[in-house]
């Protein structure tokens, strides 16, 4: 759910 690249993995992304 973060606009960064490479995208870090957070629970909110799932």
UniProtKB/Swiss-Prot annotation:
It is found in: Secreted. Expressed by the skin glands. GO terms for cellular component: extracellular region. Keywords: Amphibian defense peptide, Secreted. It comes from the Eukaryota. One of its GO terms (molecular function) is hormone activity. One of its GO terms (biological process) is regulation of insulin secretion. Its main location: secreted. Stimulates insulin release. Belongs to the frog skin active peptide (FSAP) family. Tryptophillin subfamily. This is Tryptophyllin-13. It comes from Bombina variegata (Yellow-bellied toad). The lineage of its organism: Eukaryota, Metazoa, Chordata, Craniata, Vertebrata.
């Amino acid at each position: 759910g973060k606009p960064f690249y490479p995208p870090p993995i957070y629970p909110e992304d799932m």
